Amino acid sequence: MTTTINTPHKLIKNGIEIGDWVIHTSKNPILKSTEKEEWEKELVLNGLPEMVYGNNFIRLSNEKRDITIVFNCMDALKMLDKVADQSIKVSSSKKWEEINKGFEGQIEKSFEWTFSSPYTGTILTRGHCYSNFEKPIGLFENTTEKIDIEKLKRPDPILFFDDVLLYEDELADNGSSMLSVKIRVNNESVFLLSRFFLRVDDVICRCLDTRIYHEFGKDYLLKEVTFKESSFDIIKPYSENDPTLLTDSNFIVSKLPIKSLTTEKILLSYNDNK
């Protein structure tokens, strides 16, 4: 028999207060061309995605434990390589031809046109900002514990849900590159999924999923990072009966082989004895 936990909560504008957490999302129009130019200068990048939702984010804050977890566009773009991924050079790609038209130097100086970011979120605590590989002692802990998928499948009432797009590019009609974040809150837990998805037609498919799961009352959050990648050949046969599957990111991701999977705890006790 399943016991239902009723965590005190209150809906707020674009978010929810639940337990010790305040969860907030922001969804706004794409950056204007002048704003994109400013971002390119700040990020020292020669190109940005066609659609940059620079003012979008998802934020989970626990003031009592002095920790905030954020997923935003700027931090994701900061992690882009400064040059193109040479492993995805496509001689017939219009995108590849366009970004190098008239360029007389080394091809490596062109921008990373797939916008493949290894971003897995930002953590703010003790006045510091940490992302990806920055892991202060005591904040993270390796674990074999897995996110309970069966609990996520239960038809529990959803108190709050949002789906936030951070950036998107159609690669000059040669595929798709997109970073989005979804969040779902019920009485017992919060679940977040950040997904970077890349499809370069006839070349490659790639996915980086970051899942964060927290059961209210527990002293930690689980963070699971999964990287998948394959040549386009593994997907193409499925399109023979249904061509629309080639543009269905969820379907494609379900067919990609896992290249790496890491799970760790984000410890809320990190600030207890500061």
Curated annotation (Swiss-Prot):
GO biological process, one term: TOR signaling
InterPro entries, per the entry: Phosphatase_reg/MetRdx, TIP41-like
Entry superkingdom: Eukaryota
One Gene Ontology molecular-function label: protein phosphatase activator activity
CC terms in the record's Gene Ontology section: cytosol
Family classification: Belongs to the TIP41 family.
PANTHER family: GAF/PUTATIVE CYTOSKELETAL PROTEIN, TIP41-LIKE PROTEIN
Protein name per its UniProtKB record: TIP41-like protein
Organism: Dictyostelium discoideum (Social amoeba)
